[in-house]
């Protein structure tokens, strides 16, 4: 596969104690992608049975072998990321550069309160995912589950239950409350949600899930919305959501 200009390739691996020091399936994934290396390899969820030192050594090995340029974490706690960084410094290994975290209107605390501290202390950035909360933040549900949405796909029963739960209905109501703000900015609620995620300090990119080129282009329109997200607009969004993260100090 040719590396097009501006493209960044990444892979995600899951560690178990038995798989160390070689992350499982990494070479096979590279072969399927027809790539010799990826830009970033993510360690998905810290395995409590795998010593942190061994995980950091394994990721350092991956980079030294030329299989990846950098490594990051996915769904790790701030404490685990800090431990990995400390291990890297102690043993002259390579530390993680970013954390992949869920972030959207209804999942805020980690990206807004925990990761910025790591960004300032050790330079670990954030790559966030699920900006539309698996489709909840699109106003397409409106209290029901359309036949064509992801919630009807096999394996996504949990999403259907989420949509139909009391909490899910409350979140859908908040999405509908945001429609006037989106219209004022000349965008969709989905574009507003993605731009809102991009505004967070330390967030370098937001991962998008699309099923068509048209959907991708629509989501990319959020870049035009980002410049319109003034502090006052963000305050108004926070007031409508009613769930702004606050320091526990």
From Swiss-Prot:
Binding site for NADP(+): 44, 74-75, 100, 129-134, 140, 150, 209, 211, 215, 218
Annotated compartments: Cytoplasm
Gene3D superfamilies (alphabetical): NADP-dependent oxidoreductase domain
SUPFAM superfamilies, per database record: NAD(P)-linked oxidoreductase
Tissue-wise expression: Strong expression in brain, with highest levels in neocortical and allocortical regions, hippocampus, olfactory bulb and cerebellum. Also strong in kidney. Weak expression in lung, skeletal muscle and heart.
Pfam families, A to Z: Aldo_ket_red
GO cellular component: cytoplasm; monoatomic ion channel complex
A GO molecular-function descriptor: voltage-gated potassium channel activity
Keywords (A to Z) from UniProt: Cytoplasm, Ion channel, Ion transport, NADP, Oxidoreductase, Potassium, Potassium transport, Transport, Voltage-gated channel
Enzyme class: oxidoreductase
Primary site of residence: cytoplasm
EC number: 1.1.1.-
Function of the protein: Regulatory subunit of the voltage-gated potassium (Kv) channels composed of pore-forming and potassium-conducting alpha subunits and of regulatory beta subunit. The beta-3/KCNAB3 subunit may mediate closure of potassium channels. Enhances the expression of Kv2.2/KCNB2 alpha subunit-containing Kv channels but not Kv2.1/KCNB1. May display nicotinamide adenine dinucleotide phosphate (NADPH)-dependent aldoketoreductase activity. The binding of oxidized and reduced NADP(H) cofactors may be required for the regulation of potassium channel activity.
Alphabetical list of NCBIfam families matching this protein: Kv_beta (TIGR01293)
Family: Belongs to the shaker potassium channel beta subunit family.
Protein known as: Voltage-gated potassium channel subunit beta-3
């Amino acid at each position: 596969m040719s590396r097009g200009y501006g493209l960044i390739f990444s892979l995600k691996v899951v560690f178990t104690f038995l798989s160390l020091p070689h992350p499982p399936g990494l070479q096979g994934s590279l072969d399927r992608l027809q790539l010799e290396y990826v830009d970033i390899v993510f360690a998905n969820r810290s395995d409590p049975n795998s010593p942190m030192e061994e995980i950091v050594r394994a990721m350092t090995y991956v980079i030294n072998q030329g299989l990846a340029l950098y490594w990051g974490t996915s769904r790790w706690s701030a404490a685990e990321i800090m431990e990995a960084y400390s291990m890297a410094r102690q043993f002259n290994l390579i530390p993680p550069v970013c954390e992949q975290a869920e972030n959207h209107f209804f999942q805020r605390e980690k990206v807004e309160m925990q990761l910025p501290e790591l960004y300032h202390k050790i330079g670990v950035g954030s790559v966030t995912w699920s900006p539309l909360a698996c489709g909840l933040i699109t106003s397409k549900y409106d209290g029901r589950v359309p036949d064509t949405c992801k919630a009807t796909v096999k394996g996504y029963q949990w999403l259907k239950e989420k949509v139909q739960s009391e909490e899910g209905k409350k979140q859908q109501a908040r999405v509908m409350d945001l429609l006037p703000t989106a219209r004022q900015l000349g965008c969709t609620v989905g574009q507003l949600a993605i731009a809102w995620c991009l505004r967070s300090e330390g967030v370098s990119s937001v991962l998008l899930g699309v099923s068509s080129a048209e959907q991708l282009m629509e989501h990319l329109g959020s870049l035009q919305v980002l410049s319109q997200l003034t502090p006052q607009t963000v305050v108004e969004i926070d007031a409508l959501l009613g769930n702004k993260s606050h320091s526990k100090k």
